[in-house]
UniProtKB/Swiss-Prot annotation:
Belongs to the aldolase class II family. MtnB subfamily. The gene is mtnB. NCBIfam families: PRK09220.1 (NF006672), salvage_mtnB (TIGR03328). One of its GO terms (cellular component) is cytoplasm. GO terms for biological process: L-methionine salvage from methylthioadenosine; monosaccharide metabolic process. SUPFAM superfamilies: AraD/HMP-PK domain-like (SSF53639). InterPro entries: Aldolase_II/adducin_N, Aldolase_II/adducin_N_sf, MethylthioRu-1-P_deHdtase_MtnB. Binds 1 zinc ion per subunit. Pfam families: Aldolase_II (PF00596). Its cofactor is Zn(2+). This is Methylthioribulose-1-phosphate dehydratase.
Length: 204
């Protein structure tokens, strides 16, 4: 897929995710694999519901901008580490929904476990509700290289992992194509909302 086509996919993803309330204001960042050595990412500080062709830039896999005058998101390394370690990944989405943020703060453990939900089958490789979807939660850290170093061992040990939360911050998920990553965002958001409602009903 060409740069122009990937840019359109990123722009359309931003409009969709902003419209759902999952990427408010200038939060969040999105990317697509441009080649084996380059990624296309949203420029830092841009409103995700109002992205245009100039609001994306190419970076190398170390997170360095390849376009003078354009600054990548501070969290670029969390995108490129997925492209580097998982050749099948073609798109990465990071969102800041209310449900993801609140649930990550309410959960004292370092992970969430979802089971017996039919919608688990929306995740790549899951074929039955009689399974577990484990979502790790990493503490937020302004030092992105240090945060990436904490995430990588989990990714290496859990090839089935479909996404993770950063506490008080948001969700990262990915897919072979942008449509796959968007599908998983929707599935995660459904599960997060169910979990919060279950906790409210059970008063825990």
């Amino acid at each position: 897929m060409s740069r122009e086509q990937l840019s359109v996919e990123i722009i359309e993803a931003g409009r969709f995710l902003y419209g759902r309330g999952w990427s408010p204001a200038t939060s969040s960042n999105y990317s697509a694999r441009l080649s084996a050595t380059e990624a296309l990412l949203t420029v830092s500080g841009k409103h995700k519901g109002q992205l245009g062709p100039d609001d994306v830039l190419a970076t190398d896999m170390a997170g360095n901008s390849l376009e003078p005058g354009k600054k990548p998101s501070a969290e670029t390394l969390l995108h490129t580490q997925l492209y580097s370690s998982r050749p099948q990944v073609g798109a990465v989405l990071h969102t800041h929904s209310v449900n993801a943020t609140v649930l990550s703060r309410l959960t004292a453990a370092d992970h969430l476990v979802f089971e017996d939900y039919e919608l688990q089958k929306a995740f790549h490789g899951v074929v039955t509700h009689q399974s577990q979807v484990v979502v790790p939660i990493f503490d937020n850290d302004q030092d992105i290289a240090r945060l990436a170093a904490k995430v990588q061992p989990w990714l290496d040990a859990h090839p089935e992992c479909a996404g993770y939360l950063i506490r008080g911050h948001g969700l990262y998920t990915w897919g072979a194509k942008m449509s796959d990553a968007l599908r998983q965002i929707e599935a995660f958001e459904f599960l997060f909302e169910c979990e919060l409602k279950m906790r409210a009903v059970l008063n825990r």
